[in-house]
Amino acid sequence: MNFHEYQSKQLLAEYGIPVPAGKVASTPDEAVEVANSLGKGPWMVKAQIHAGGRGKAGGVKFCKTTDDVKAAADKMLGTKMSTYQTAGVELPVNLVLVTTAGEIVKELYLSILVDRGTKTVTYIASSEGGVEIEQVAAETPELIHSLNVDFVEGVQGYHGRDFGFKLGLNAKQAGQFASIMVNLYRLFNDKDLALVEINPLAILDDGNLYALDGKFDSDDNAAFRQKALVAMRDKTQEDETEVTASELDINYVTMDGNIGCMVNGAGLAMATMDVIKLNGGEPANFLDVGGGANKQRVIEAFKLILSSDKVEGIFVNIFGGIVRCDMIAEGIIAAVKEVGVKVPVVVRLEGTNVEEGKQLLRDSGMAIIPADNINDGAKKVVEAVKNAA
């Protein structure tokens, strides 16, 4: 789950990590009220969407007067914004964050994440903040420093001071940096996070460090014990079909192709998409209907797939280990009847009660195309889509 900047800053502040004073507003007049409550300007007005790169998209404005604040908020609120991170998708701007704006002396980068390569929690820091860390890694890798955390020792003050001096900070600032690192580790563990990125972590004109922006990513597998984080979810920033799928407990990800996929098992689902591409097609989605799929879940899965008008064909690829193929067949037949499927449907069944399942499909009288294996199914759905065009 992703978070808005203002939510990230609330969490950072709760754990003693300095952030500029600020508050969200949903109207231009409210933005002015927030600015006045923060005291004398200047201020920053920042559009709240689940994406970085807002500055280049016009979503971050420096304001010297309250008239500037009102104008900036008026221009952002109620609009839709896309950045280089949204892949062309426009996200609604329902809130703006108004904060104090100090003069930036130096921008740093600091993040903490789960490093799958080293199987540890890892800090990454750089003296080059305010830009994409991937760009720094490609152009000046010597400016990036990392620390793999020992789970027994944890993070100590000396780790942070060592990092701080490597980044060119003075003794006072290195001490602040150490405090931020230690507190960030507590936050990371307490909230079951997968990533916290502070970019930039800035030195302002008062000589102190502040987190000017924060990006959080939580571990959805821990959502059951993080009710406060779940309550922060903003579904307006997410793909509508993916939101519906999550409510049905179906693993679904929208993609750009035209061949819908319904598969049981994440590994088989990924393999199915690969084979479709190898046969010249483009998958429209990742959909893992789950090992405990039943007739109703199959119907709901078809509805999810066909909610996209880009879908021109469907490939159902089921290996019946826990799930029974005859039950899947009943679900497919019911879905075709209930949803009114008008695109080619190719079905590959294998496993428990496979012959009964295939017989049900044959007896249905529906134009369902059978497939012998995954490659045969991918070829047939690609050909069927081409022939139907």
UniProtKB/Swiss-Prot annotation:
Binds 1 Mg(2+) ion per subunit. InterPro entries: ATP-grasp, ATP-grasp_succ-CoA_synth-type, ATP_grasp_subdomain_1, Succ-CoA_synthase_bsu_CS, SUCC_ACL_C, Succ_CoA_ligase-like_bsu, Succinyl-CoA_synth-like. The keyword Metal-binding applies. It catalyses: succinate + ATP + CoA = succinyl-CoA + ADP + phosphate; GTP + succinate + CoA = succinyl-CoA + GDP + phosphate. One of its GO terms (molecular function) is ATP binding. Substrate binds at N264, G321, I322, V323. It is an enzyme of class 6 (ligase). GO terms for cellular component: succinate-CoA ligase complex. GO terms for biological process: succinyl-CoA metabolic process; tricarboxylic acid cycle. Keywords: ATP-binding, Ligase, Magnesium, Metal-binding, Nucleotide-binding, Tricarboxylic acid cycle. Its cofactor is Mg(2+). Its EC number is 6.2.1.5. Pathway: Carbohydrate metabolism; tricarboxylic acid cycle; succinate from succinyl-CoA (ligase route): step 1/1. Residues 9-244 form the ATP-grasp domain. ATP binds at K46, G53, R54, G55, G102, E107. Gene3D superfamilies: ATP-grasp fold, A domain, ATP-grasp fold, B domain, Succinyl-CoA synthetase domains. Mg(2+) binds at N199, D213. HAMAP family: Succ_CoA_beta (MF_00558). Heterotetramer of two alpha and two beta subunits. Succinyl-CoA synthetase functions in the citric acid cycle (TCA), coupling the hydrolysis of succinyl-CoA to the synthesis of either ATP or GTP and thus represents the only step of substrate-level phosphorylation in the TCA. The beta subunit provides nucleotide specificity of the enzyme and binds the substrate succinate, while the binding sites for coenzyme A and phosphate are found in the alpha subunit. Belongs to the succinate/malate CoA ligase beta subunit family. This is Succinate--CoA ligase [ADP-forming] subunit beta. It comes from Xanthomonas campestris pv. campestris (strain B100).
